[in-house]
Swiss-Prot record:
Residues 41-47, 112-132, 200-222, 280-346 are cytoplasmic. Residues 1-19, 69-90, 154-178, 244-258 are extracellular. One of its GO terms (cellular component) is plasma membrane. PROSITE patterns: G_PROTEIN_RECEP_F1_1, G_PROTEIN_RECEP_F1_2. This is G-protein coupled receptor 42. Its main location: membrane. InterPro entries: GPCR_Rhodpsn, GPCR_Rhodpsn_7TM, GPR40-rel_orph. G protein-coupled receptor that is activated by short chain fatty acids (SCFAs), such as propionate. Hence may play a role in the regulation of whole-body energy homeostasis and/or in intestinal immunity. The chain crosses the membrane at residues 20-40, 48-68, 91-111, 133-153, 179-199, 223-243, 259-279. It is a multi-pass membrane protein.
């Protein structure tokens, strides 16, 4: 794309992009940190296969959130990359890898949930923890291998122009780069989005049907929340983003609206904690207990701070009263001395 040196490839409002990144960071980071504490505690006390998958999903979200400040700096700089160039492909690789990791782990969780309900006896006899660990490794490798195209694109062809014509990061591409990137994006949309979506839809539709026939109302509500949060992730956060892959492949260039649907995909780190919450009653109980402890610590800290503040005010009042006491004492002493002199004269 031919643009002048002072023009930006991005014609939208970069502060809107910054605001979405900031909101995602402020909301997603504390929620995922709380989820991390809960999952670590659960795995130490009563390890379950689905918690291994959800712990990896939490780690993926936290990795995205930790690298999100780089994107915030880029957005605040008008979508130009002001940081060292080596951070550009790294942040892009982490960003896109974690997005597709969410889709893969959500599909794996749906399989676990379906098997635990549809085949409970067989499910209990299987060594699920080891298999969950292998599935997690496979998901990380599959997503990382596909998203390594970021490095291929950034360092392909003319290295001097690999960082975009205007100092942008993974926004502008030459024709030879698009010839590699667009087919890979299409393949990623099929393998890392459509296939997990089909698997997840099948597993949860069967799960809802089975529980609708004989499950408790409480469990039905929990599964309904899990399905709603999962479908929200797939259809709202990831759907438009992967549609941009298909449109880009057909049109032969990246759609101009791609940046906005990419923002939707980052919001998955705020939606995932709801998936965790509805994943099991055990997580809900542990989460409520953790919140209760945090609220107790907060109340204790406020009480101690209030007592310290009162003590400080009391000390200041005492120091303020001391000069007045001295003046009163000096005045009374002066009057006593004068009286004695008068008596002596008489």
């Amino acid at each position: 794309m031919d643009t002048g040196p002072d023009q930006s490839y991005f014609s939208g409002n970069h502060w809107f992009v910054f605001s979405v990144y900031l909101l995602t960071f402020l909301v997603g980071l504390p929620l995922n940190l709380l989820a991390l504490v809960v999952f670590v505690g659960k795995l130490r006390c009563r390890p379950v296969a689905v918690d291994v998958l959800l712990l990896n999903l939490t780690a993926s979200d936290l990795l995205l959130l930790l690298f999100l400040p780089f994107r915030m700096v880029e957005a605040a700089n008008g979508m130009h990359w002001p940081l060292p160039f080596i951070l550009c492909p790294l942040s892009g690789f982490i960003f896109f890898t974690t997005i597709y990791l969410t889709a893969l782990f959500l599909a794996a969780v749906s399989i676990e949930r379906f098997l635990s309900v549809a085949h409970p006896l067989w499910y209990k006899t299987r060594p699920r923890l080891g298999q969950a660990g292998l599935v997690s490794v496979a998901c990380w490798l599959l997503a990382s291998a596909h998203c390594s195209v970021v490095y291929v694109i950034e360092f392909s062809g003319d290295i001097s122009h690999s960082q975009g014509t205007n100092g942008t990061c993974y926004l502008e591409f030459r024709k030879d780069q698009l010839a590699i990137l667009l087919p890979v994006r299409l393949e990623m949309a099929v393998v890392l989005f459509v296939v997990p979506l089909i698997i997840t839809s099948y597993c949860y539709s069967r799960l809802v049907w089975i529980l609708g026939r004989g499950g408790s109302h409480r469990r039905q509500r929990r599964v309904a929340g899990l399905v709603a949060a999962t479908l929200l992730n797939f259809l709202v956060c990831f759907g438009p983003y992967n549609v941009s892959h298909v449109v880009g492949y057909i049109c032969g260039e990246s759609p101009v609206w791609r940046i906005y649907v990419t923002l939707l995909s980052t919001l998955n780190s705020c939606v995932d904690p709801f998936v965790y919450y509805f994943s099991s009653s055990g997580f809900q109980a542990d989460f409520h207990e953790l919140l209760r402890r945090l609220c107790g610590l907060w109340g204790q800290w406020q009480q101690e701070s209030s007592m310290e503040l009162k003590e400080q005010k009391g000390g200041e009042e005492q120091r303020a009263d001391r000069p007045a006491e001295r003046k009163t004492s000096e005045h009374s002493q002066g009057c006593g001395t004068g009286g004695q002199v008068a008596c002596a004269e008489n």
